[in-house]
Amino acid sequence: MNPNKALLEKGDFTRIAKSMRESGEALVQRLGITKGLKVLDLGCGDGTTALPAAKLGADVLGVDIPRNLVEAGNKRAREHALANCTFQEGDLSDLHQLPDQAFELVVTVFGAMFAPKPFEVAKEMVRVTRRGGRIVMGNWIPNDPTLVAQILKISSTYTPPPPGRLRQSDDVGDREQRNRAICWRRSSSRKNILHARHVYIQLPRRTVSARK
């Protein structure tokens, strides 16, 4: 079992999610979302990013591993009368229930960064993204001044990371090498990658776009 599932189902993480609403809305406003856009929100929680995207007219599917957060997300979607926004349980490292190239935008905000198998998650994100689509990640970074980021940085000093995951204190060069490796897993040619860049808003995000 994914250890995150047991942990997240023990508490009420919707209380934490409420403190992140502004971040999700700020990110969505910068993504150029249009009516009918096919969006996948990974590590969606109770819809911090998914609901704002759906309110702009996108067809949104949220996937997360804890049942309680998925149920909370579907409840919020019903309360806002958003029939174009649904949530389902799923392991981000194994999205076998989703077809290849099904989404024009794949987004994960403070979600995939916690996955025990980051490389597998990256492969799945690329697999389900249409050619010409976009992958957008919002992550805390080592020098992020927010309280949660500092807690994660301190705790990572005393706990070994799962296999394949980088510590927040790891060298930038190592992180960039991992980023290149993720890109190369999509194809033997890097022409599939349009651009990879860091963009900073209220909280930082990393965006990757793929093209034919």
Which ranges hold each PLM region?
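Conserved class I S-adenosyl-L-methionine
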Residues: 1-37, 48, 72, 79-80, 134-161
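Class I SAM-dependent methyltransferase SAM/SAH-binding core
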Residues: 38-96, 120
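A short SAM/SAH-binding and catalytic strip from SAM-dependent methyltransferases
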Residues: 104-119, 141
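A short glycine-rich, Lys/Arg-flanked "PGG" loop and its adjoining helix->strand segment in the class I
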Residues: 119-134
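Acceptor-substrate binding/catalytic loop of class I
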Residues: 143, 162-177
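Conserved Class I S-adenosyl-L-methionine
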Residues: 172-212
